[in-house]
Amino acid sequence: MKFVRGFPSTMMDDYQLNLINILRYAATNFPEREIVSRKHDENIFRYSYGEAFKRVCKLANALEKLGVEVGDRVGVLSWNTHRFYELFFGISGIGAVVVEMNLRLHPNEIAYIANHAQVKTLFVDETLLPLAEAVASKTKIKKFVVISDNCFETKLPEAYSYEDLLKNEDSRYDFPMIDETSAFAACYTSGTTGMPKGVYYSHRAMVLHTLVVALGLSLKAEDVYMQLVPMFHANGWGVFFAATLAGSKLVFPGRYAVDNLKPIVELMQSEGVTVTAGAPAVFIPLLTYLQKIEPKPQFNIRAWSGATEPPIAMMKGLKEFGIEIIHAYGATETSPVVCYNYVKPELARKLSENEIWELKRKQGIPVFGVEVKLVNDKGEELPKDGKTIGELCIRGPWVTKSYYNDPRTFESFIGEGWMKWWKSGDAATIDENGYIKIVDRFKDLIKSGGEWISSVDLENHLMAYPKVFEACVIGIPHPKWQERPIAFVVPKPEFRDKISKEELLEHMAKRFLKWQLPDEILIVKEIPKTSVGKFSKRTLREQYKNYYQKE
């Protein structure tokens, strides 16, 4: 593919795509549409897009007085609240960069991110002050702003109150036209290999991404969107930007835990939620909770979910409560949306119901603007036949072309310049209809006796068993077979003492060959997880690496 420059257009191509214009649009055209935020005391705060824009103007004025300048990196440690929402627009609106800090990381990793990004100012939720205090001395952060409704005490130097800063500021601000290729936010990968890697998102990338997300979820002003995905995780998947553009009502649930989803379900019911997004780590416990309570609630919700392969039991179970799971795929490096799954009309007409459910488990087809291909270990492109497994490589206008100030960039990309592709590390197939299926992470595929075993396939079949809540499969070194799979199973609470390894193996033997079955199935209370809720297979592999040396 070559690059050519054609005849010049007469369009205003110098008009820059800036993120602040999304909120300005909503405030102008949907000024009364509501934004709802659940506070730590479980009281509900309500205001409108029109009021939110005025507060963002106040925030912009306050940031200038704090000494925040164009290009400065400003850290945010917060839950999903209306103030985090304001910070995204206020910080980026003046030309600075929102550094999304994963509050579930170790303090040393948070300090690393702050130093690597050269964060000078940190906004921190009052409930996270102990974490900020533990990090502060390891960084060069000069100013701290506490996000709180109350008076607070802290050991942090030069600490300000968020609301006090905004209180007397002008509710008007002349936002600059920012070069659209400038960064508006940064997110650091969760560090599955070494320390976190920085991805810096441009205004242009996020505005284009927002348009595609709004289209993919068919967002409208009548919709009510709940932000379940942590807003520090790849811009909260960017859906709240798309919902803002559509003029949808926004619901921010604040701090919540998957082992107590009652407040979330109550909020979904009281606010009339119609759209949400989240990982199976949220939706599986949600299904378990809904199955327990009486009376059974009924929703009308379309929900994006991202996973290697969502369990059919989860998708079918939530469907009974009116929650339609739409499978999607992405990564921090892709802003994050790469593809989402919808059944093409011509396939819907000829596939059986079971075949449609199987199709829905695939990642889907790439969204407009994103290109994908499969390559082998030599970088050669592989066929899209639904069978050949290769590494999924991705490029597009909201895909990163490097990691910020990080030598690991070299090993993560192929190609040069605008022809560059990001190597996802995912083992995948692409079928003749364009549907991507993630088979596994390459590092999680199990090589046994020269043959590959997908840990994901084993996990999903285990999780389809009625007594199983969660299941994780890893490969561990074996003296004869190179690697062998072992499984970790968390039973549903009511079956904790009523489940056996033998019945699980019998269940799995109906689908898998004997050599593919786990050598061991361990019944455990919990499975370790990463900061973004995925199974921490690295932790398990380290713990069980000498398992066969005991024999």
Report each predicted region and the residues it spans.
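Gly/Ser/Thr-rich phosphate-binding loop
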Residues: 245, 273-278, 287-358, 371, ...
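Structural core segment of the AMP-binding/adenylate-forming
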Residues: 23, 65-66, 93-167, 493-495
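Conserved ATP/PPi-binding loop(s) of AMP-dependent carboxylate-activating enzymes
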Residues: 349, 365-369, 377-413, 451-453
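Conserved AMP-binding A3 loop
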Residues: 45-50, 184-208
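Conserved pre-ATP/AMP-binding loop-to-beta segment of ANL
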Residues: 31-34, 158, 167-188, 195, ...
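Conserved AMP-binding/adenylate-forming core of the ANL superfamily
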Residues: 35-81, 85-89, 106-111, 161-163
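AMP-binding/adenylate-forming catalytic core of the ANL superfamily
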Residues: 105-111, 120-124, 269, 276, ...
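Conserved AMP-binding/adenylation subdomain of ANL enzymes
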Residues: 207-224, 234-274, 284, 289-290
